[in-house]
């Protein structure tokens, strides 16, 4: 299991929002697949990160607006202060008894549940059949759909990545067969 990247602060069956101590260059990123425990550990809700926001605070505004913010003030704010960073994730499925389900979870995670990025092996298993795509298509954030597909492709051996993206494009085409403009834009975004 991966290292936690934050804790749930708000949640519903549609998704969850979590607080993150600080941004790591690798996670969380837009499109990261992560999970949070629900039902007392009986299930894990799988979410796709669709927003990362860094809230300001009065001290940050004060330092940023000063004519000469010295490096010590900036370092103190970046390293020592609790910068309010939030990630928002849409629920794209859940894990129960090591099986993947591609519907909304029966219950949301509880507040303070750890948010853990899926491992490469979990991402490969969860994204293998493209069953998660309808939820993303219905969320109407094509950038997110493309980001999740590209990230899932990157977890696979290099020789499989192109074929995986083609399969993802076909799955999107079946769902968007009456919206060619949106489909064409999405296909362009899927390209690595």
Give the positions of each predicted feature.
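Short beta-strand-centered aromatic/proline hotspots
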Residues: 4-9, 32, 43-54
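Short, basic/aromatic beta-hairpin or loop at an interaction surface
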Residues: 1-17
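Charge/polar-rich, low-complexity and marginally structured segments
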Residues: 80-192
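Charged substrate-recognition surface patches at the periphery of nucleic-acid/ligand-binding domains
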Residues: 49, 57-80
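Short, well-ordered loop/turn sites that connect or cap secondary structure elements
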Residues: 26-29
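Short, solvent-exposed secondary-structure boundary/capping segments
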Residues: 15-20, 55-68, 89
């Amino acid at each position: 299991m991966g290292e936690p990247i934050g804790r749930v602060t708000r949640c519903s069956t549609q998704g969850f929002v979590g607080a993150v101590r600080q941004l790591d260059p690798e996670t969380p990123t837009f499109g990261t697949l992560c999970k949070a425990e629900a039902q007392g550990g009986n299930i894990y809700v799988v979410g796709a990160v669709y927003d990362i926001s860094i809230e300001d605070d009065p001290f940050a505004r004060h330092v940023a607006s000063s004519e000469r913010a010295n490096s010590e003030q900036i370092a103190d704010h970046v390293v020592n202060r609790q910068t309010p960073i939030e990630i928002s994730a849409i629920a794209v499925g859940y894990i129960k008894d090591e099986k993947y389900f591609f519907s909304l979870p029966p219950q949301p995670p509880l507040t303070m549940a750890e948010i853990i990025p899926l491992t490469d092996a979990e991402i490969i298993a969860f994204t293998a059949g493209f069953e998660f795509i309808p939820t993303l298509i219905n969320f109407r954030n094509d950038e997110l759909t493309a980001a999740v597909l590209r990230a899932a492709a990157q977890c696979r051996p290099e020789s499989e990545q192109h074929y995986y993206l083609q399969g993802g494009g076909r799955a999107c085409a079946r769902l968007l067969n009456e919206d060619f403009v949106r489909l064409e834009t999405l296909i362009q975004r899927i390209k690595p």
